[in-house]
């Protein structure tokens, strides 16, 4: 959820759009939770080849998600961050561990830069009080820059991301078409047939 990650996403969109198998040179993005949130940041960078986005089960503010009401979210957020911290270690995911064990030297060399990653949970706990510079990472402050059609879904009872996302729906002011489907349900229901 950083400006560097959004820039990487811009590059991915433009790289994929230039592949010979991409019809008309345009791509869309779809994803639930982290991939949904990430595409909001990417779309705000306005990649020329991005056709539309479908973010599902997202949040509007990273800090308020981690510190709702000023109290550290030691439930889902802590567990989610701990899992990410484990996965970013060298060989921290089954697929990269298997590639290394099979002798993939490029994968092994790429994994060496993993030591540059920081402890997300420790970082999140350190931000006890909202700081003005955190606004740069507020999802809600980026969505007014999105200039492609948006289909966004979210559950009022989402046990992982909550319902605060609805506060930013009015801010999709530059998107030529928007459709928001809000429903009673849970986090993974963004993929369900009911939406």
Q: Model features per residue range: what roles?
A:
Residues 41-145:
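Accessory cap/linker subdomain of secreted extracellular hydrolases
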Residues 146, 152-154:
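Short beta-strand/loop motif that positions the catalytic acidic residue
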Residues 32-34, 54-63, 184-187:
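Active-site nucleophile loop of the alpha/beta-hydrolase fold
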Residues 4, 190-195:
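Post-His helix in hydrolase/transferase enzymes
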């Amino acid at each position: 959820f950083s400006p560097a990650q959004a820039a990487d996403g811009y590059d991915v969109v433009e790289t994929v759009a230039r592949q010979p198998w991409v019809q008309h040179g345009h791509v869309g993005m779809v994803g639930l939770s982290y991939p949904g949130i990430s595409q909001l940041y990417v779309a705000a960078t306005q990649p020329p080849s991005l056709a539309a986005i479908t973010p599902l089960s997202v949040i509007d503010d990273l800090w308020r998600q981690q510190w709702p009401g000023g109290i550290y979210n030691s439930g889902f957020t802590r567990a989610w961050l701990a899992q990410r911290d484990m996965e970013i270690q060298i060989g921290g995911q089954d697929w990269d561990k298997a590639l290394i064990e099979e002798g993939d030297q490029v994968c092994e060399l790429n994994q060496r830069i993993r030591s540059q990653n920081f402890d997300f949970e420790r970082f999140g706990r350190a931000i006890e009080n909202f700081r003005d510079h955190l606004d740069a990472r507020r999802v809600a402050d980026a969505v007014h820059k999105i200039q492609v059609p948006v289909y966004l879904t979210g559950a009022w009872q989402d046990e992982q991301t909550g319902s605060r996302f609805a506060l930013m729906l009015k801010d999709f002011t530059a998107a030529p078409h928007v459709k928001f489907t809000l429903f009673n349900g849970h986090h993974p229901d963004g993929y369900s047939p009911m939406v």
